[in-house]
C-alpha cells in the first residue's frame, strides 16, 4: 500500500476500535433493523435500460489531494439537486479525518431524496459494514488496494447478508483479477492512483478488455467534462461516479445534467 493509503487504513482501524466501545454491535443491529433498503444495482440498471448514463453523484466536501471542494456544503440540498437532475444513486463520504465527511451527511442526504446511497469510506472491518447499514446506506465500497483477497470476500459476503450492494474498486490489472473473485456485478475503476493521487481516465479504458460482460464498469475520478463522458460512452462505459466536477459547480445537479444529459 502507499504511504497515504497506509495512513488512512491505520486511522480506520483506530476508528473501529473506538466505535466498538461507544456503539456496541447489538446497538447497531437494532438501528439497522429500522432502516429500509433501496436497490442500488437496480437503479443503475434502470438508467441503462432507458439508454441513459447511470450517474452515482457524490456528496463530498473535501479530499486529501484537492482540499475543500465546496465551502457552502448542505448535503440535503445537494442530494435533492442531484435527484432532480437525473442521478441514479448517491455516494456520500463518511470519512472524517481525510475527506471531512460524516455519517450525519449520509443520513441527511438520504432523507432528502429517494435515491439509493453508497457509503464512501475505507472499509477494513465488518463492524463498518453494519455501521453503514445502521446509518442508512444501501451499498458499500471495498477497495482492493486496501484489503487481502480473502478478507474482501468475507466482507462482501457479510454486506450481502445485510442486503447491501457492493462496489469493488480497482486501479490496475492485478487488482481487477482479485476483484473478479467477488460476486458483485459492480466493478469500479478508480482513475486516480491511490499511491500517487495522479489521475488519468485512460486507466478505465485500459481495463475494458479484461472486463466480463456480466459486470458493470463504474468509472471513478477524473470525469470533469462532457468530452470525458462522451469518450467513455463511446467505449460502452455507461456508469460514472463523479464528485469534484459537481461539487465545484454553483448548482451540482445542473452541472450533472449539463455533462450527462
From Swiss-Prot:
PROSITE patterns registered for this protein in UniProt: IGPS
Gene3D superfamilies: Aldolase class I
Any single Pfam family the record assigns to this protein: IGPS
Biological or metabolic pathway of the protein: Amino-acid biosynthesis; L-tryptophan biosynthesis; L-tryptophan from chorismate: step 4/5
Keywords of this entry: Amino-acid biosynthesis, Aromatic amino acid biosynthesis, Decarboxylase, Lyase, Tryptophan biosynthesis
Reactions the enzyme catalyzes: 1-(2-carboxyphenylamino)-1-deoxy-D-ribulose 5-phosphate + H(+) = (1S,2R)-1-C-(indol-3-yl)glycerol 3-phosphate + CO2 + H2O
GO molecular function, one term: phosphoribosylanthranilate isomerase activity
GO terms (BP aspect): L-tryptophan biosynthetic process
Enzyme Commission number(s): 4.1.1.48
Family note: Belongs to the TrpC family.
Record-given protein name: Indole-3-glycerol phosphate synthase
Organism: Paraburkholderia phymatum (strain DSM 17167 / CIP 108236 / LMG 21445 / STM815) (Burkholderia phymatum)
